[in-house]
């Protein structure tokens, strides 16, 4: 009974946390600033929910090795699974929000597409690779540069507003279009939004997500493999 209650609370938190932010942003941008985007609630949550997965994983990764210091010191195991498990857990929270997206689709007279069956796993795997690459870099470097968390928090907030989550990508002036072009997080969000709202797979965005994700993972694992032998003494 206790386990069931804990699972229920976990599910409620997975849904309530991003939904609360969605309500706040809806009030500010739709009701106050009157942003003219059709089906804005669906538009908002299809960008905000996957963003929450990335942002929570990246932020939590900063302390993933520090929080597991005793296990790292006393047990021999692939330590890279620690940030990976965090990414997977946040991904599970994201999957819990998909029923909420379905409900809002029906509210706005839209329906899920059959392409979700293969589209969700395809984009989700790309996001796992991308987010793991970022997480392994942050979790490793934060052991040696403890002030990194301040810069990461600032960077994530900056990237949130540079990514078309609250606004449509076509609202950006031509001279600032590079913000989307060179922002892999924009490709990630737009991939999800195209799938959920239009039932389409934008393979250009998905390819960018995979390409940058693989590069980040290779770089991250290289940094990790160079520094992992010093973990015990640092911790």
Task: Label each region the model flagged.
Residues 1-235:
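Hydrophobic transmembrane alpha-helices and immediately adjacent juxtamembrane helices
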